[in-house]
């Protein structure tokens, strides 16, 4: 549907008030507009009254029946905001709605994964049917077909809801109750119904707990989860969330947008203003979080004298269990363990209060302080995949699911997260070691960034400097917000953004001038273009050939004939090292749908790589080049003059093609462990390069020092941010952030200016290879949930083939010698 048409429907514009251009887009047909109004209203589950649809559809009951049918067919969440209509008018309770959905998908023999995430979570809550239960039901359904008396799917489904969690501040409303229903009620149930009929809706906590459950199970009442303008909520690690699929309907999209934007200090009204979303929709979404148990309402929600005695033994919505005093969680990133207050010992922990802490809400973990801006650590989905796949500790998965689905792990939940990371062992075997390394390095990074007084300037003698809180944010979730909204959310809550390094090429990095960003300044800095920019300004780099989409190779270019291993980067995907012997078919397949960068990596097996952390220390720069003092390399000295490495942090990967003098222990494990292989879509097995580089980072062996010369090493890539794949590299970067005072006000101001300069230079460099008519390729990346921008969206594809060889970047025509020198002057430009 046209966005202009949607806007005018949302604003209740009748046909005669529509602008001429909108009418023209509808073919000047009022009937077409009426069809769009009805479709939009049903898709967005709009109430009949006070909306434009009432002028289009005269029969209110029929409209709601169509809405319910559409929602059921598309497996949408039950429209709880229309409960008064659905339950009282149509006698369709949430239980009966989800039973019909389950019956439909079982009759069609669909998999459990066909249920969208939030719908599956609500089915689990009400029906008690999760993945395993669904598989059992399907097996029973199929086996019954073999016998004469086959059972229908409905016969196998539960007859009444499982016992749900009800919070005392929820509101109980009467549903559709007949005289026959009243006759079978107990005395207490009749009294409760009479009170609601006479006095109106009642707080659940003021009624007898078992009566509320009994009436709900029979469908005589429904439950409202009231959210006011000034309500604040907290989101603990998700329990009971089902990771199936993202559907993309209006409400699910809204739920994900609010997930990543919400925080404990911002009330619902303020959040609606920041997101520029209708307040009623935001309340509906927050109400749904609380209903599903994914969020907890903060503050005193019901006074103790209102609470019926029966509620004392009632179960509560899942809560984050805190087992440490937050005042004792001021952590030392150097020591890696909590810094206990003077005079305290391990036995000083208040063990008598642990049971109370188990049921405490998330807010009890936060260090009492006035609302303050925070540091945001930006990560991508590969990190959450590592935390999920590694089976690292029993309760770590719920945090990883929260990081992926909510897109955020707030400071209030980091105590629990750190305790789970503490349980991760430091050693593992094979592939699992990579997951363990990332988990342990992530823990060290959190300890370093969170409440680190070395990262924040003193506020004065009256204000104690304890550092800043830390939130973890998933880049893909932020990209689900439009750029203006994302900027408002970041500016409202954060003082500094820090990216992990490297971020996956499959996502578009977050660009931000304010708050300042220690990470890629613009998406182009995380693209293939930036590699070529580095090579052109330093005059050094591996032989590299960037082929435009649609190119075709008849043979491997001569510059790569001497190489045993090539580094292949398909546009919008992560790089992989592949053998040169069988690369041609793979390259031509990838070139049909993507631009591809080919680089020489190793002449005798894999090339050797070393990571050089920056900012550089002055003492190291004054020294002579050596394997252990790589920052004295002449290419890096040139790079320092062209790119600001003093007010940023990250690492530069140096590559040595001639690695005959050393054989890694990992080489004995075979090529499968280290080589990334492009799949049919041109992507590769993720992080194959990281594995190899990580092995190389620690590979300082006897004889390497003596045989390394400066000319053997060339810069391969530069990554801004904090590396997580190597704990030693991460430790060095953390030390230099402190020693170079990167988070000081002056340094951050310099970072702002230098990031803008770098952005302009890189954009100018990219533009020099465009014909001015090259559009951004919509198929250049992989789109994910919430219709996020595709990878490298807005980053132009190359219009010509480019070759970097012998210190110069040239246009490559496919013949030797190459023509047209392009970027030799780049190295002579002043900064």
Swiss-Prot record:
GO biological process: intracellular protein transport; vesicle tethering to Golgi
Protein source organism: Danio rerio
GO cellular component terms given for this protein: cytoplasmic vesicle; trans-Golgi network
Pfam families from the UniProt entry: FAM91_C, FAM91_N
Subcellular location: Golgi apparatus, trans-Golgi network; Cytoplasmic vesicle
Primary location recorded for the protein, binned into one broad class: Golgi
Location of region: Disordered: 341-362, 690-709, 770-794
Function according to Swiss-Prot or TrEMBL: As component of the WDR11 complex may act together with TBC1D23 to facilitate the golgin-mediated capture of vesicles generated using AP-1.
Source lineage: Eukaryota, Metazoa, Chordata, Craniata, Vertebrata
Superkingdom of origin: Eukaryota
Family the UniProt entry places it in: Belongs to the FAM91 family.
UniProt entry keywords in alphabetical sequence: Cytoplasmic vesicle, Golgi apparatus
Family annotation (InterPro entries): FAM91 (IPR039199), FAM91_C_dom (IPR028097), FAM91_N_dom (IPR028091)
Subunit composition and interactions: May be a component of the WDR1 complex. May interact with golgins.
Official protein name in the record: Protein FAM91A1
Protein's gene: fam91a1
